[in-house]
């Protein structure tokens, strides 16, 4: 049986990566962005780093900030309606896993309206159409959601999380800019960094691993192991290497899966409402 490997069409890495957003949008003929970003990122000026790029280029956008930790079915449904009303033709996800997951759900449902009941997307989703194009701008170095084919939505009614796996949801372009992560506090940097390291280790030992995924996971372990302490201290070098290391881990585990750790914290984070 052949092994499949799914990645972004394009990705930008390093300081100033977000400066390429305008060129990518114009080059693809996009007219208006629907920006998914949580209220804290708006409050502390992180989202503004991206909107400044769009403003400078004269590109239109609308900001949707009703992003919750552990996004629920209802959150995503509201997002779908807001997207439809906005007149946007692509999404920009700014944030950690929650913003990315919300954007993926919105993009998939808009492009595949027959799956408007998000519960029908749980597991390996049988969608036929690619999601509305997503530009992903991570602000944490942990989940690597900008390069993965899965997203997690909470069913609040049943108090459970649904993992949705769909090759059609992967962002078309990722902009992995360490400057977007520089405002993370030490505790969050450490926690997301360990999340990334766990992804790399589990991806390497999972049953689905093979030579190509091994290459990514081993390199990710190497980079994260030397970079995490520096990232916690907010050194430019540490931030940049962690941004790259967690992305490389995502390139691997998105294609071969993980182990028991994500299953465990899926249940542990429901009461605390945390998603990094």
Protein language model features and the residues they cover:
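N-terminal small/polar loop signature for handling phosphorylated ligands or for N-terminal nucleophile
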Residues: 42-115, 227-239
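Glycine/threonine-rich beta-strand-loop-alpha-helix active-site module
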Residues: 74-81, 85-176
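Conserved small/polar residues in nucleotide/adenosyl-binding loops
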Residues: 266-272
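Carboxylate- and glycine-rich phosphate/diphosphate-binding segment that chelates Mg2+/Mn2+
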Residues: 150-256
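Predominant activation on well-ordered alpha-helical scaffold segments within soluble catalytic domains
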Residues: 22, 51, 62, 77-80, ...
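Short, hydrophobic/aliphatic alpha-helical segments
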Residues: 1, 76-88, 179, 236-265
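An N-terminal, well-structured beta->alpha segment
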Residues: 1-64
